[in-house]
Curated annotation (Swiss-Prot):
Residues annotated to bind [4Fe-4S] cluster: C75, C79, C82
Highest taxon of source: Bacteria
SMART domains noted in UniProt: BATS, Elp3
Pathway: Cofactor biosynthesis; biotin biosynthesis; biotin from 7,8-diaminononanoate: step 2/2
CC cofactor note: Binds 1 [4Fe-4S] cluster. The cluster is coordinated with 3 cysteines and an exchangeable S-adenosyl-L-methionine.
Function (record text): Catalyzes the conversion of dethiobiotin (DTB) to biotin by the insertion of a sulfur atom into dethiobiotin via a radical-based mechanism.
Intrachain S-S bonds: none
Annotated GO biological process: biotin biosynthetic process
Cofactor list: [4Fe-4S] cluster; [2Fe-2S] cluster
Residue span, Radical SAM core domain: 60-281
Family annotation (CDD domains): Radical_SAM (cd01335)
The keyword Ribonucleoprotein is annotated on this UniProt entry: no
Record-given protein name: Biotin synthase
Amino acid sequence: MRDSVIDIRGLDRVQRARVQAKEEAPKRWSVDDIVALFELPFSDLMHRAQSVHRENFDPNGVQVSTLLSIKTGGCSEDCGYCPQAARYHTDVEKQDLHAAGRGTRSRVLPRRMRQPFCMAAWQPKQRDLEPVLAMIREVKAMGLETCATLGMLKDGQAEQLKEAGLDYYNHNLDTAPEYYGEVITTRTYQDRLDTLDRVREQDINVCCGGIIGMGESRVQRAGLLAQLANMERPPESVPDQLLTQVEGTPMYGMDELDPFEFVRTIAAARITMPQSFVRLSVGRQSMHEGIQALCFLAGANSIFYGEKLLTTGNPEAEADRKLFDKLGIHPL
């Protein structure tokens, strides 16, 4: 009796990836494997990453996403990079959920349909979750893909998000397990993995990446990618942030990462997670457009669009349009 074969031609990209993941034994990446990628000559690494990218995506297409903070500041965690932590003296003004969430519709309406629209708030209490669910339903009704980043989830909350129509949940690992204690002490690495498990159990797409340039070593950058690539199902979207140093946070004043090391990280992410969107996230404002172009060549195919990401700056919309025109890139 012949095994049944699924015709994947009529499926969208995410559905195809799920079918192929079941039919093909995934490669498990060791940290040493990924370090070896980092150590390739730059042109060889770029060629390999671009080849993998072309096998899985339109090489000239970039997903354009929008991020809206619906609750800002006053967070009880101690993430060393984050100006929203209440314990740090930064210029971030606290804004409660209801005030920040007003005007969601006006922020969404100008956007092109099917663009992912991400709503960010840190750990809303259960009583605050209903307004978030209402925002998800509202954005979903406009035909956009919905994404939320709300921090740790408790039992039952992922199910509520799924029922509201959430497409993606963002929850980053930040860094490798070995370096995590240098970044945050109020939550464990396992806490983050448990939240991702809750999201996966509800069959919500996962957006998960990290922050590069927090003082971690190259081996630790490889360790983060190994964590992501070796998940039972790798994240559908992998945001790679370049540390934005904010005065008042413990990581302000750190040595800046060499830009080519960031490009290498993008290339290694593309090779190890060939079917994931690799997103240039926070930190793009400080990148020369030549470095951004190299990141796209290395396999980055998603950006956040708009002048502000949560509490940090982002390239102006017109600058992004001009860069896309120079590079022959079109929005997906």
